Amino acid sequence: MKDCEYQQISPGAAPPPASPGVHRPGPAAPPGPSPGPAPGAPRWSVSGSGSGSGSGSGSLGRRPRRKWEVFPGRNRFYCGGRLMLAGHGGVFALTLLLILSTTILFFIFDCPYLARTLTLAIPIIAAILFFFVMSCLLQTSFTDPGILPRATICEAAALEKQIDNTGSSTYRPPPRTREVMINGQMVKLKYCFTCKMFRPPRTSHCSVCDNCVERFDHHCPWVGNCVGRRNYRFFYAFILSLSFLTAFIFACVVTHLTLLSQGSNFLSALNKTPAGVLELVICFFSIWSILGLSGFHTYLVASNLTTNEDIKGSWSSKRGGEASVNPYSHKSIITNCCAVLCGPLPPSLIDRRGFVQSDTVLPSPIRSDEPACGAKPDASMVGGHP
């Protein structure tokens, strides 16, 4: 069945001629031009056409969509796709609340007294640490961690065909793994059934964000994002600077309470600075976890490992197997630190701000029994009438 193209008839156009042998009853129309349709009620005619030119006219008034609007993962985008965050943001909001509230209370109740009594450098150091911590946190949270775009329909079909061709003639399904050699070490590449591709080395699929992330370290709900190749340096700088800020505020609050309690008891000092108790509680319970996390990631950076690799024991004997050499290590702590923290930042691969292109099929010589990728099958192939 041919496609139909609708064209508007001008009001002064004559009606189409009647087919031969067909009698049209009714009174004859008076001579003269036809009155035409009423205002607001245009007439339409249907003309057969084999081309799909009518589909372009219907999309003239439609706003072109950007790629972040149809992104298949569970991320949320802000500012027109310029910023991205994980699907859940409650824990990230709690992180912001704890940092902001503790620092604001410190600047209101402790900094004025310490600046007058000791030195003006205390509020300056606290302000520098605070702005550096917030900058690293926002960069970690709103930066693309290294998401790999999913395979298109054509790419997935070609890869499936390639996998089927490599399988044996038995009923056993073909293997979904590949092996590559990296610095003399055999590394196994696994197939991602969600993204329809073989994951590159050190890439893993995050079950929370539903994305394959390059050099996947872990998913951190405290920063509201995955930690991967493109934002790991910001994450490491964030936890390291946050440990310094927490320890600095804790030491300053203790010093403030000690100076106030010299002329009186400790309870009267607490009455003068009621926010000091809240600051001490938050800093005391935060500093141990933050310092431990900073030390653990310092070990990972020096060894050029990821949290995912360390937990799985990929290059150690944690799971009872033989310990193997880490193929990504440069055999030097300084070189590993420079490679992880100071290397060039790769560009984002998902093109969040790009426009969604319409699915067009390029003319190519194909077999008559195999439709082109992206083309609709003929009606006779799906049980319809030709």
Curated annotation (Swiss-Prot):
Its EC number is 2.3.1.225. InterPro entries: Palmitoyltrfase_DHHC, PFA4/ZDH16/20/ERF2-like. GO terms for biological process: innate immune response; negative regulation of cGAS/STING signaling pathway; negative regulation of innate immune response; peptidyl-L-cysteine S-palmitoylation; protein localization; protein targeting to membrane. Keywords: Acyltransferase, Golgi apparatus, Immunity, Innate immunity, Lipoprotein, Membrane, Palmitate, Phosphoprotein, Transferase, Transmembrane, Transmembrane helix. It is a multi-pass membrane protein. It is an enzyme of class 2 (transferase). Residues 1-65, 362-386 are annotated as: Disordered. The active site is at 220 (s-palmitoyl cysteine intermediate). Residues 110-117, 255-275 are lumenal. GO terms for molecular function: palmitoyltransferase activity; protein-cysteine S-palmitoyltransferase activity. GO terms for cellular component: endoplasmic reticulum; Golgi apparatus; Golgi membrane. The chain crosses the membrane at residues 89-109, 118-138, 234-254, 276-296. Residues 190-240 form the DHHC domain. It is found in: Golgi apparatus membrane. It catalyses: L-cysteinyl-[protein] + hexadecanoyl-CoA = S-hexadecanoyl-L-cysteinyl-[protein] + CoA. Palmitoyltransferase that catalyzes the addition of palmitate onto various protein substrates, such as CGAS, HRAS and LCK. Acts as a negative regulator of the cGAS-STING pathway be mediating palmitoylation and inactivation of CGAS. May also have a palmitoyltransferase activity toward the beta-2 adrenergic receptor/ADRB2 and therefore regulate G protein-coupled receptor signaling. Belongs to the DHHC palmitoyltransferase family. ERF2/ZDHHC9 subfamily. PANTHER family: PALMITOYLTRANSFERASE ZDHHC18, ZINC FINGER DHHC DOMAIN CONTAINING PROTEIN. The DHHC domain is required for palmitoyltransferase activity. This is Palmitoyltransferase ZDHHC18. The lineage of its organism: Eukaryota, Metazoa, Chordata, Craniata, Vertebrata. The gene is Zdhhc18.
